[in-house]
Design a protein with these regions (language model features):
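A glycine-rich, hydrophobic/aromatic-adjacent loop/helix-cap motif
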Residues: 1-188
Length: 188
């Protein structure tokens, strides 16, 4: 699949005709909402694990030295916690551009903290996209992150901001926190 997924996402019609759509964020969308939204609520999606397996050549790395950012991996026993935003379809163009580095819009059932649910969408970078880096140990991922930077800043800032946002939500993530632990140890 192409690295730039904007055109693919613009052809998706699942939410055509909707005046508003819930968007589930599990990475930088938790702590950096640079788009207008009608509502924001802590939420989760079942059957997915957050993993630092996606390369970032556009935000937290470069073509020559990609950073690592999160995507979701199918995991029947897992629940991924994050933040849901109610947005209008007019925001899709901005979001598609922001998530262009291999992420596709997919429909998902979002569960809010009060146990109510809504159909919504999530951006997921699947293993068949050109920027996918794949599985590595948390220690190796931390070393990779420590040396990467891109137009949006050092890759380490992304990891640390995500870990802090998850703490503020009261939703620990063992994978994220273990990478953070290794990164802090590397910094000495």
């Amino acid at each position: 699949m192409s690295l730039d997924t904007v055109a693919l996402n613009q052809r998706m019609t699942h939410f055509d005709g909707h005046a508003e759509v819930w968007l589930f964020g599990y990475g930088s969308l938790i702590f950096k909402a640079d788009f207008p939204f009608l509502a924001r609520r802590p939420a989760s999606i079942a059957g997915w694990s957050r993993r630092f397996w996606q390369g970032s050549m556009d935000h937290r790395g470069t073509q020559e030295a990609p950073g690592r950012v999160v995507t979701l991996e199918s995991d029947a026993l897992a629940t991924c916690h994050g933040m849901a935003y109610l947005v209008t379809p007019e925001e899709f163009a901005h979001l598609d551009h922001r998530e262009k580095n291999g992420y596709l819009r997919l429909p998902v059932t979002i569960t809010f903290d009060d146990a109510s649910t809504a159909e919504g969408m999530v951006y997921i970078a699947t293993a068949d996209n050109a920027a996918y880096l794949g599985e590595a140990s948390e220690a190796d991922i931390a070393r990779h992150i420590a040396g990467a930077a891109g137009p949006s800043g050092p890759n380490r800032d992304y990891l640390l901001a995500l870990a802090q946002a998850l703490r503020e939500l009261g939703r620990p993530d063992a994978h994220v926190f273990e990478i953070e632990r290794h990164l802090v140890a590397l910094a000495g």
